[in-house]
Amino acid sequence: MKNKIFNMVFFVLCFFLLNTNIAAQNNDVKKEKWHWGNALQQDTSAGYVQVVKVENVLYVSGAVARDVTPEGITRVYQALERSLKSFGATFQNVVKENLYTTDMEAMKRYNDARKVFYKGDFPAATWLGVSRLFMADAKLEVELI
């Protein structure tokens, strides 16, 4: 009797897990894209899109600068601002920032150029010092969620 009950419970559990997996596979994620006004809404040569919106969350690809100066940092954050505005968002909607730089000391020194865009409402942030970015001459890249 115990064996029959165990087999029945096992069968029901397997059936439930199988159906849950099938349902998850049929659940299409609706994505909206924006890529600098590009008609395809993506860069097919590099294989990325600047902004992907899933439900009410924006995933913003990195914007880069060739120099870690107040001017370079400002250009990066202006590009990110344009990316956010493509879906009606601002820096006050940003919850996570990932910053990659080949010159961390300069980034720390000129951080005020970055902070002005957040207007005192800062996101969770991770800053990483790296030896190189995708664009060989880039020294700063910032991505947002």
What are these model-predicted stretches?
Residues 5-7, 20-95, 101-145:
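N-terminal presequence-like segments and the immediate start of the first folded domain
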Residues 9-19:
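Bacterial N-terminal signal peptides
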Residues 1-2:
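N-terminal hydrophobic targeting signals that begin at the initiator methionine
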